[in-house]
Regions:
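Helicase-associated low-complexity/disordered flanking segments
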Residues: 2-256, 261-266, 518-537, 542-543, ...
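Conserved P-loop/Walker A NTP-binding site and adjacent catalytic elements of P-loop NTPases
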Residues: 244-397, 401-409, 413, 417-420, ...
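Conserved C-terminal RecA-like helicase domain
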Residues: 295-296, 305-308, 313-326, 496-576, ...
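Conserved interdomain linker/interface between the two RecA-like ATPase lobes of SF2 helicase motors
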Residues: 406, 411-418, 423-504, 551
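A short beta-strand element within the Helicase C-terminal
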Residues: 576, 583-599, 628-631
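C-terminal helical accessory/scaffold domains
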Residues: 666, 695, 699, 703-713, ...
């Protein structure tokens, strides 16, 4: 028998055993004739078995069941270092040698004998009580708490080691695949892999623990070796970013006292100055050194996905998580992780939802840093109010969270800094020199800043002369084709146009003016791009332009088309991109030359901020050696453009006033502020209190007006209503008064609106729609549910009423029933076709039903071009409606979860949101979950044999580049890292669930 580690005696004390035994024998004087039998069976018998004095001395516990004897044998395994054991009596030690059946028979016979005795004494209540006392005294013997804790810790460590093994296996798949590991053979889940212990075939748990400790030590020792990051980060920046040393301003910024002391900071530099790199280093420090999570706020979904793509390689190697919060993606609230930290990359709206969910669960302290890109958007209508709400809420909570903002175009930088209570760091640095020009007539003038008393001066540079024919001159009087041909095809050029239609016209014009060398450049890549665009159903004009290395890029294109064009532009297959101003603030596409076709954005004259964003795309480090910008300006437009250039960047003013009620409502719902004075204090933390002309009395008035509106709408309530007093304000027509100490609470509708991150108007309309649907929901298909999540403003789409009747006539039974429920009949369709007004059905219902029919066709996987043609809409509009509906479905699911009477809709809408996100074939769904992987790329991967994310995770860059056409090695590496990051996140989600269970069990 293996040696048994001696532990402290935990059985009943000997003196106490003798006392209870004497009482027991006296109480059974009437059954003395059976005392011998009882003594043999008594669990407190002093009878011993000679199996070692050590065991006999320490253990005299009752017999254990056979299964516990088996557990003892497991504990006494080959591992002699075990520090825990189960104390057993000599009887148990002896019986453990017997077979299980023999042990069971002995136990059964003795139990039967005891039962005979007990039957004789059941009439004596006093004797029964004595027996109960003795039984309780005997069987409540417990192990030492330290031994129990050790068992719990061992169990917990074993589970955590299993997850660590899986994570390291994914991170080191390159080495694992070399050893022909079967970690990612075709299986359905990681749980199966863990359960079957396939991971133990190539990694031993002890080795993992030792390697983990070595890595942790290395991280600590390597701090401050590469700008405060582990030394491995230096190699990652070199490999994936081609960065070996930071710019001087970046080093200066990272070593600021405000950064060291974790004070809030705003840093402002021109576009392309390297601002994002500083933010990334700060976030890496936060998750690696301080072990806190970081939140990165970005303005657009495309930029979120681009940043997820870029940081995945760092996350896999440095062992942290990158989580996407955009559109329908992201867990609300986020998974609570105890082993790894996360960088949450989110849009403004999703960032607010994330912060609110953490506050509600008292987990906001898990975030240590919030970084806001394009901070100037705080002054933009709509989204600016959401961003201000987010930042004001964080400031008011006072949770020691550092806020870092960055922007190139803030006119009132110090006012924004006052609002954020932040230090300011400002430099005028560009790694690539930018030369700015203005074209007046045929003369190109260079813009000289600061040379004139008024701040800007034009200096004649050269006269433009090209070998244009008379026909070409008539076609292109502004000489745009000549300006483009000076840099392409060897260089790249962005042409900013005022409208989407203008983008298409300019691209068509340039195709007619390009030379032969432009046509022959990268011909094979362009032919492949043509094929891909045709497969997406792109316009013939766009496909034709691609042959010349020219394309247009605007919101009217589907996201798959835009993604293909962006990749082609980066690879050089597309040399000229005609785009709208939204590209300047969106996807990162630098150029050697930027041309602004006219000083207009839509119908409005260009602002200095928009101008800075556009020209900032010219000349990016590592991409172009020089940068040039040219504004084509007419003689009549020059005075106004000159005033814009001299006027300075517009200030970012608060746009919170219309949304102040939503801020106050969320504060009450989250119990941040539930009285009127505290709510005023919250408003004092906003940009509204800094940049507006509002005085403290105005802030008080805004607070009271907002409270009055919330009370009247029924989403806010006073806990204990009282009559008028000196410190009360009259806030409603029903003699409802609110005192300074009156507690406020939020109604169920208000809580649901906060959970769903909805405006009250949207929440009320959604509730009305759901209540109507609950009485007559059509579940023959998806149409009625799709109607419920169509944008409530119909996304600005007005249907073609002449086409409405033909759509109505083609409806199946599901469509007719849904239309009937909504009040739409054939008579209505006929009136629409004939142009007669409809009075019995609101126009917005007709518009939303039109969009619901469109979404149903997408749901049934009708191609985007066919849907766009059928409903007379641009493909970009179709995709925008689908994305908006998916987001609303996700919000509506959380809204319904807060209202018990709508529980059934919660399940339906949750499933709807997931499927509506892509509306792709089932085999493409998982691949399209990866960042920046659209349908076209997913189809390429599927044809190359990569059917699952796991297939991509175990692939090599060489295999991907050879199997997928026109995929660069760098893009292949990032795609592999993104796949591995996705799998690691799944494993960490399972770990979080396991840890939650163990926490519930107090393990």
């Amino acid at each position: 028998m293996h040696s048994i580690n001696k532990i402290k005696d935990t059985s009943t004390p000997k003196r106490r055993r003798l006392g209870t035994g004497r009482i027991f024998r006296l109480s059974l004087s009437k059954t003395a004739q059976k005392s011998d039998l009882l003594t043999d069976c008594s669990p407190i018998s002093s009878k011993s078995v000679d199996i070692g004095a050590d065991a006999t001395e320490r253990c005299d516990s009752p017999l254990l069941p056979c299964n516990q004897v088996e557990f003892r044998s497991i504990c006494d395994s080959d591992n002699n270092n075990s520090s825990f054991d189960v104390p057993c009596s000599p009887d148990v030690l002896q019986s453990s040698v017997k077979s299980e059946w023999e042990s069971l028979n002995v136990c059964t016979s003795k139990i039967n004998e005891i039962c005979e005795i007990n039957n004789e004494i059941t009439n004596n209540q006093a004797q029964t009580e004595v027996l109960e006392d003795i039984s309780e005294d005997m069987f409540q013997s417990k192990l030492e708490q330290s031994d129990i804790n050790h068992v719990d810790k061992s169990f917990k460590d074993k589970i955590e080691q299993s997850f660590d093994i899986v994570n390291q296996s994914i991170s080191n798949l390159d080495e694992v695949m070399k050893n022909k590991s079967s970690m990612f053979e075709t299986r359905d889940s990681f749980l199966l892999d863990i359960k079957e212990d396939a991971i133990e075939k190539f990694v031993h748990p002890n080795q993992v623990v030792q390697e983990s400790k070595k890595k942790e030590t290395a991280v600590v020792n390597a701090n401050n070796t590469f700008y405060g990051l582990p030394l491995i980060a230096k190699g990652l920046f070199k490999t994936y970013r081609n960065i070996e040393k930071f710019y001087e301003w970046q080093e200066e910024c990272l070593n600021l006292e405000s950064v060291r002391e974790r004070r809030n900071l705003i840093y402002a530099l021109p576009t392309s100055g390297g601002k994002t790199l500083v933010a990334e280093v700060l976030m890496l420090r936060e998750v690696l050194n301080r072990k806190k999570n970081a939140l990165f706020i970005l303005p657009f979904v495309a930029i979120v996905q681009e940043k997820i793509w870029a940081l995945s390689t760092f996350a896999v190697q440095l062992e942290f998580l990158v989580e996407e919060y955009a559109a329908g993606k992201g867990h609300i609230p986020p998974k609570k992780r105890r082993r790894k930290n996360s960088i949450y990359i989110a849009t403004i709206e999703k960032g607010l939802a994330l912060v609110r969910s953490l506050i509600e669960l008292d987990r906001l302290h898990e975030i240590g840093l919030i970084v806001v890109d394009e901070l100037h958007l705080i002054g933009e209508k709509g989204r600016g109010g959401t961003l201000e709400t987010l930042l004001s809420t964080v400031i008011f909570t006072n949770q020691d969270i550092q806020i870092v903002g960055m922007s190139a175009t803030i006119g009132n930088l110090h006012e924004i800094a006052q609002f954020l209570r932040a230090d300011v760091f400002q430099r005028q640095f560009r790694p690539v020199e930018l030369t700015e020009y203005v074209k007046l007539g045929t003369m190109l003038h260079r813009v000289v800043w600061g040379a004139h008393a008024q701040g800007v001066e034009l200096v004649p540079h050269r006269e433009l002369k090209y070998d244009y024919s008379a026909a070409a001159t008539a076609l292109d009087p502004d000489l745009l084709g000549g300006l483009v041909s000076e840099v392409v095809p060897k260089g790249s050029c962005l042409v900013f146009c005022s409208t989407k239609r203008n983008c298409e016209n300019v691209a068509s014009l340039l195709c007619k003016l390009q030379r032969r060398e432009m046509i022959s450049h990268k011909k094979a890549e362009r032919q492949a791009l043509e094929s891909a665009l045709r497969a997406e159903g792109a316009n013939a004009e766009l496909v034709q332009a691609v042959r010349y290395g020219i394309a247009y890029h605007h919101a009217g294109l589907a996201s798959d088309e835009r993604s293909l064009l962006e990749q082609a532009y980066r690879s050089g297959a597309i040399s000229v991109l005609c785009c709208t101003s939204t590209l300047a603030a969106g996807v990162n596409l630098p150029a050697q030359r930027v041309i602004i076709r006219a000083p207009l954005v839509g119908r409005d004259f260009i602002t200095l901020g928009a101008y800075r964003q556009m020209v900032g795309r010219a000349g990016r480090a590592g991409v172009c050696e020089t940068g040039e910008s040219i504004v084509i300006c007419g003689s009549r437009e020059w005075p106004q453009l000159q005033a814009v250039l001299r006027g300075g960047i517009a200030a970012a003013r608060s746009v919170l006033r219309p949304g102040a009620g939503a801020l106050l409502l969320s504060a009450v719902a989250l119990k941040l502020a539930t009285t009127r004075p505290k709510l005023r204090t919250l408003l004092d933390c906003t940009l509204l209190a800094v940049t507006g002309d509002d005085t403290p009395s105005d802030i008080k008035s805004i607070c009271d007006d907002s409270l009055r509106s919330l009370l009247q709408s029924g989403v806010l309530e006073v806990v204990n209503k009282r009559q008028s007093g000196d410190d009360a304000s009259h806030l409603s027509e029903k003699d409802c008064y609110i005192y300074n100490d009156s507690e406020l609470t939020v109604s169920s509708l208000g809580k649901a609106a906060i959970k769903g991150c909805m405006d009250l108007s949207v929440a009320k309309q959604l509730l009305l729609d759901l209540e109507r649907a609950s009485r007559s929901l059509v579940l023959m298909g998806s149409l009625h549910l799709l109607y419920l999540v169509t944008p409530h403003d119909a996304a600005g789409v007005r249907p073609d009423y002449s086409h409405y009747y033909s759509l109505y006539c083609s409806l199946d039974e599901e469509g007719v029933q849904t239309a009937k429920i909504l009040g739409i009949t054939e008579h209505n369709a006929i009136r629409m076709m004939t142009g007669k007004p409809i009075k019995n059905v609101p126009e917005i219902v007709l518009c939303r039903f039109y969009l619901a029919l469109m979404l149903q066709d997408l749901w049934n996987q009708m191609p985007f071009p066919a849907v766009a043609y059928k409903y007379s809409l641009a493909r970009g509009t179709v995709q925008s409606v689908m994305s908006s509906s998916a987001s609303l479905a996700s919000c509506a699911a959380r809204f319904c979860a807060e209202l018990p009477r709508l529980w059934s809709f919660c399940a339906l809408l949750t499933e709807l949101a997931g499927r509506l996100q892509h509306c792709a074939a089932p085999e493409l769904q998982h691949l399209m979950e990866l960042p920046n992987v659209k349908k076209a790329r997913a189809m390429q991967l599927l044809r190359a044999g990569y059917k699952r994310v796991e297939d991509l995770a175990k692939a090599s860059a060489d295999e991907l580049t050879s199997g997928v056409s026109h995929l660069s090695r760098n893009a292949a590496n990032q795609l592999i890292s993104a796949a591995r990051m996705t799998l690691i996140e799944k494993v960490e989600n399972l770990r979080a669930e396991a840890e939650d269970v163990m926490e519930e069990l107090n393990v």
